[in-house]
């Protein structure tokens, strides 16, 4: 990497061609994810249908949100990517909104994460994640030196990330962990010195061990008394995940234990091709079948083939993002698109690992597939930003092709007159 406006020495060389342009491939992946979302959310929303008494209400709302999201993709896609730096202003705004959540936040599923706007519940943590990634990418691009990122970049990035995660963690531990992990990987890509990354990894590992021990062994009554009610939920999830013994009926937590059990049943009964779209049985027993556990419903209905196909879509998206970064000539765009890709795919990985029982329940939705409000719209903005940077790369390659063609034409014109000179015969 060079400085902000420099050319990467491993950047575009010559004119590269591919069978399918990057931006078209990303559009196709996006549309596939939306199509799967429509089918599976419609199937998995049976609990919402029972509660509301409206068969078409949940899917109509979801379709409307996807349409608004697609419009957002198109709008952001047409914004020149140099303007994305202005989105850094969202960082202090998101911090203020996260503080406001503690005061006026709506309590949903035992957590204060949303601000109720009437027509939609707004989740400031989603905006905070986006603003943090944009800001970190900007800092890394501005502080690149010949041998890597300036050591001060590490301090600035840690300060911003700790502030954001600190405002999120009390009500949404998994989102804070997701953001911290994404920033760490982005710093690795941004060539932050290994000594600093190693120190951060050691501190992070120690905090995880201490945090798990603290949450696991301090009685829930203590957490309730000091107002940290979410600790009780985390304690239950950790105990359920690591404890293989049978849970007594008196201690059975319907919200967590039953969901995990029914998700396991959904996957175990799926086989290769599944039961077919709309034929899920466990959706009627999973209260979050349309969100946290939608991947289990996908596997139940579409089988292992369908589950693998969804995972491959996210892998292909990450590969396309890597290709955009490899062909880009500006370090800010490289770090921004890479950070978005890491955050997007890491969140999908969290959701999938929870559904198959490898991780404790986190509450992270499956990007662009789970039913959601703010998360869906912000994910659509991510896709729009990726497409905008992809368009910049395409324009760059086109410009390079034109310059190369002009250079070859000029060289051929210089050589042509020399070849047309006819030597004169010597007079005798």
Predicted regions and their residues:
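Single conserved hydrophobic/aromatic residue that forms the stacking wall/gate
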Residues: 1-18
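Short clusters of hydrophobic/aromatic residues that line enzyme substrate/ligand-binding pockets
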Residues: 7, 115, 272-273, 277, ...
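Hydrophobic alpha-helical transmembrane segments of multi-pass inner membrane proteins, especially
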Residues: 27, 31-43, 52-255, 296, ...
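Transmembrane alpha-helices of multi-pass inner-membrane enzymes
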Residues: 35, 357-402
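Transmembrane helix boundary and interhelical junction motifs in multipass membrane proteins
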Residues: 172-177, 275-278, 290-291, 359-362, ...
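Long extracytoplasmic/lumenal interhelical loops at the membrane interface
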Residues: 259-302
């Amino acid at each position: 990497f060079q400085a902000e406006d420099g050319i990467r020495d491993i950047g575009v060389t010559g004119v590269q061609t591919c069978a399918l342009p990057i931006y078209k491939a990303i559009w196709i992946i996006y549309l596939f994810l939306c199509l799967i979302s429509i089918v599976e959310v419609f199937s998995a929303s049976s609990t919402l249908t029972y509660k509301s008494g409206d068969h078409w209400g949940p899917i109509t709302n979801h379709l409307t949100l996807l349409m608004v999201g697609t419009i957002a993709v198109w709008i952001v896609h047409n914004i020149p990517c140099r303007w994305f730096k202005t989105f850094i202003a969202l960082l202090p705004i998101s911090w203020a909104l996260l503080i406001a959540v503690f005061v006026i936040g709506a309590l949903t599923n035992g957590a204060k994460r949303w601000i109720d706007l009437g027509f939609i519940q707004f989740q400031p943590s989603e905006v905070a994640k986006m603003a943090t990634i944009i800001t970190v990418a900007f800092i890394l691009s501005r502080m690149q030196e010949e041998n890597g990122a300036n050591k001060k970049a590490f301090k600035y990035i840690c300060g911003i990330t700790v502030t954001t995660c600190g405002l999120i963690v009390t009500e949404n531990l998994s989102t804070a962990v997701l953001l911290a992990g994404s920033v760490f990987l982005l710093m690795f890509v941004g060539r932050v010195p290994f000594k600093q990354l190693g120190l951060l990894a050691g501190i992070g590992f120690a905090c995880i061990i201490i945090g798990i021990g603290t949450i696991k062994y301090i009685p829930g009554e203590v957490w309730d008394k000091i107002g940290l009610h979410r600790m009780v939920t985390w304690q239950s999830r950790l105990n359920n995940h690591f404890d293989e013994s049978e849970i007594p009926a008196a201690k059975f937590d319907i919200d967590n234990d039953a969901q995990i059990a029914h998700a396991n049943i959904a996957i175990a009964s799926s086989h290769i091709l599944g039961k077919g779209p709309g034929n899920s049985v466990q959706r009627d027993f999973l209260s979050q079948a349309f969100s946290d556990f939608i991947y289990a419903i996908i596997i139940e209905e579409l089988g292992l083939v369908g589950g693998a196909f969804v995972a491959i879509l996210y892998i292909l998206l990450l590969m396309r993002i890597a290709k955009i970064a490899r062909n880009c000539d500006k370090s800010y765009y490289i770090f921004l698109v890479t950070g978005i890709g890491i955050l997007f795919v890491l969140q999908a990985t969290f959701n999938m690992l929870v559904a198959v029982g490898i991780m404790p329940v986190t509450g992270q939705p499956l990007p662009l597939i789970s039913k959601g409000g703010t998360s869906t719209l912000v994910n659509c903005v991510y896709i729009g930003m990726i497409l905008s940077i992809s368009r910049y790369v395409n324009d760059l390659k086109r410009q390079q092709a034109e310059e190369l063609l002009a250079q070859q034409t000029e060289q051929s014109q210089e050589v042509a007159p020399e070849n047309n000179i006819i030597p004169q015969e010597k007079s005798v």
